[in-house]
């Protein structure tokens, strides 16, 4: 199984209930693509480097998923249809990209 990073930026103005609804939908989309979630980092609202739509902030969710095959298109295409999702990025995790801390 390959490991992937799934990074999402959500609408910064959504409530805690809506965030939970989005998390549930994301979990279902990942499972439907034949993958499993191994880690979730909920970073909350952060300032964006540039404006996305009318927003200068975004609600960040970073998942680590394990999947066989190529789940990128199946997961990303279903998540991009959501109204509260601003950006989706699925990247294959490679150990050589990790930096070593001194």
From Swiss-Prot:
InterPro entries: Ribosomal_bS6, Ribosomal_bS6_sf, Ribosomal_S6_plastid/chlpt, Transl_elong_EF1B/ribsomal_bS6. Gene3D superfamilies: 3.30.70.60. One of its GO terms (cellular component) is ribosome. GO terms for molecular function: small ribosomal subunit rRNA binding; structural constituent of ribosome. GO terms for biological process: translation. The keyword Metal-binding does not apply. PANTHER family: MITOCHONDRIAL 28S RIBOSOMAL PROTEIN S6 (PTHR21011), SMALL RIBOSOMAL SUBUNIT PROTEIN BS6M (PTHR21011:SF1). Binds together with bS18 to 16S ribosomal RNA. This is Small ribosomal subunit protein bS6. It comes from Deinococcus radiodurans (strain ATCC 13939 / DSM 20539 / JCM 16871 / CCUG 27074 / LMG 4051 / NBRC 15346 / NCIMB 9279 / VKM B-1422 / R1). The lineage of its organism: Bacteria, Thermotogati, Deinococcota, Deinococci, Deinococcales.
């Amino acid at each position: 199984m390959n490991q992937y990073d799934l990074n999402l930026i959500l609408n910064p103005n959504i409530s805690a209930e809506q965030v939970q609804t989005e998390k549930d939908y994301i979990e279902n989309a990942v499972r439907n693509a034949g993958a499993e979630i191994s880690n979730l980092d909920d970073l909350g609202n952060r300032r964006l480097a540039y404006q996305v739509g009318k927003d200068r902030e975004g609600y960040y969710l970073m998942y680590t998923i394990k999947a066989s095959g190529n789940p990128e298109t199946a997961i990303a295409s279903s998540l991009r249809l959501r109204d509260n999702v601003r950006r989706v990025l699925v990247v294959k995790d490679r150990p050589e990209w990790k930096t070593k801390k001194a």
